[in-house]
Swiss-Prot record:
Disulfide bonds: none annotated. The keyword ATP-binding does not apply. It comes from the Bacteria. One of its GO terms (biological process) is L-tryptophan biosynthetic process. InterPro entries: Aldolase_TIM, Indole-3-glycerol_P_synth, Indole-3-glycerol_P_synth_dom, Indole-3-GlycerolPSynthase_CS, RibuloseP-bd_barrel. One of its GO terms (molecular function) is phosphoribosylanthranilate isomerase activity. This is Indole-3-glycerol phosphate synthase. It comes from Acaryochloris marina (strain MBIC 11017). Its EC number is 4.1.1.48. Pathway: Amino-acid biosynthesis; L-tryptophan biosynthesis; L-tryptophan from chorismate: step 4/5. It catalyses: 1-(2-carboxyphenylamino)-1-deoxy-D-ribulose 5-phosphate + H(+) = (1S,2R)-1-C-(indol-3-yl)glycerol 3-phosphate + CO2 + H2O.
C-alpha cells in the first residue's frame, strides 16, 4: 500500500467553530499513515520555533559524526547489536514506567552493544530529541535517530542533537526523496539506515545508488504485526545480490530469544536492532543494577 501524504484540508467555518466532513480521502488508513500525517504538522511547528538555517548553523558547530557502519562491521557480538532506547510503542503501550534513557544507554554500552538507536518521536513512542542529546553526552557509541523522516529538516535536527545515523523508511518516501535525503546524510558525514518490509521495497532501494545499510523490519508498520520470516524470505530472494553490493543487513523487530537471533543470522543478517525485549523490566529489577540486568539479557540473547 502506498502511504499517502495528508490531503489539503477542506473545512467549513461556522461562526467560531470549524467543521470537516470525514471521508476515506481525508482519514488515515493505517497507523503508519496516521504517523506520517502527524509528522507533517509537527515539522511545520518545529520550523516555526527553529528555522532550518539556524539548525544548519548548529550542525556546523557539531563534532564530526561517528561511523555507524564501521561499528556494526566490527561489533563485539555476531550479529552486531543495535540496542534501542524505547519507552513505548503504539502496539504495546508503555514498555517501562521507570524510564531513564541515559541509564539505559549507558547499560547498553557496558553490556557490549555496537550502536544505539534512540526513539525521538514523542506523539506515538514517547521519545524525544532531548533524549538523543542527553545520550550523546553520556556514551561513546554511534547513535541512530529513530524517526519518521519525511523532510530534510528532521535530518539536520537529528545531527544537531548528536545523531550519527538516521532511519529512512522506504514505505513513506519516494525514490526521489530517498536519493535526495541520502545525499544530505552523506554530506553531513552520517550513515543512512534504509528500512524495508517487502520484497518490492527491497528491490526498489537496491537500485538506488549509495545505500550501504538496509534494515529489514519484521514488523508491518501498517498493522504492527510481526513475523521473523520477513527477514528470512527477503534474504532468500536477494541475499546474494546484497552481498555482491556490499550492503549490510539489519534485522529489526520481534527478536526476543537466542533462537530468534540464530534464525536471522543464518538467513544472512549482519546486525540486529532490539528494543522491547531489552527495555522491559524483569522481576529482579530491584536487586540488580541496570548494567547487570542488561548484561544478563544480552548474554542470554547471544548465547
Amino acid at each position: 500500500m502506498q502511504i499517502r501524504r495528508r490531503p489539503p484540508s477542506v473545512a467549513v467555518n461556522v461562526q467560531e467553530l470549524q467543521y470537516q466532513v470525514k471521508t476515506p480521502e481525508n482519514e488515515p488508513r493505517n497507523i503508519l499513515e496516521k504517523i506520517v500525517w502527524f509528522k507533517e504538522t509537527e515539522v511545520e511547528q518545529m520550523r516555526d520555533s527553529v528555522s532550518l538555517l539556524d539548525l544548519r548553523k548548529q550542525v556546523a558547530n557539531c563534532e564530526p559524526p561517528l561511523s555507524f557502519l564501521d561499528a556494526l562491521k566490527h561489533g563485539k557480538t555476531q550479529p552486531a547489536l543495535i540496542a534501542e532506547v524505547k519507552k513505548a510503542s503504539p502496539s504495546k503501550g508503555v514498555l517501562r514506567e521507570n524510564f531513564d534513557p541515559v541509564a539505559i544507554a549507558q547499560a547498553y554500552e557496558a553490556a557490549g552493544a555496537s550502536c544505539l538507536s534512540v526513539l525521538t518521536d514523542a506523539e506515538f513512542f514517547q521519545g524525544s530529541f532531548d533524549y538523543l542529546q542527553q545520550i550523546r553526552a553520556a556514551v561513546s557509541l554511534p547513535l541512530l535517530c529513530k524517526e519518521f523522516v519525511i523532510y530534510p529538516y528532521q535530518i539536520y535536527l537529528a545531527r544537531s542533537r548528536g545523531a550519527d545515523a538516521v532511519l529512512l523508511i522506504a514505505a513513506i518516501l519516494s525514490d526521489q526523496d530517498l536519493t535526495y535525503f541520502l545525499k544530505i546524510i552523506k554530506s553531513l558525514g552520517m550513515t543512512a539506515l534504509v528500512e524495508v518490509h517487502t520484497l518490492p521495497e527491497l528491490e526498489r532501494v537496491m537500485d538506488i545508488p549509495g545505500i550501504e545499510l538496509i534494515g529489514i523490519n519484521n514488523r508491518d508498520l501498517e498493522t504492527f504485526t510481526v513475523d521473523l520470516e520477513v527477514t528470512c524470505q527477503l534474504l532468500a530472494q536477494q541475499g546474494t545480490s546484497l552481498q555482491d553490493q556490499d550492503i549490510l543487513v539489519v534485522s529489526e523487530s520481534g527478536l526476543h530469544t537466542s533462537a530468534d537471533l540464530a534464525q536471522v543470522k543464518q538467513a544472512g543478517a549482519g546486525a540486529v536492532l532490539i528494543g522491547e525485549s531489552l527495555v522491559k523490566e524483569t522481576g529482579n529489577a530491584s536487586t540488580h543494577s541496570e548494567t547487570e540486568q542488561m548484561q544478563a539479557k544480552i548474554s542470554a540473547l547471544f548465547s
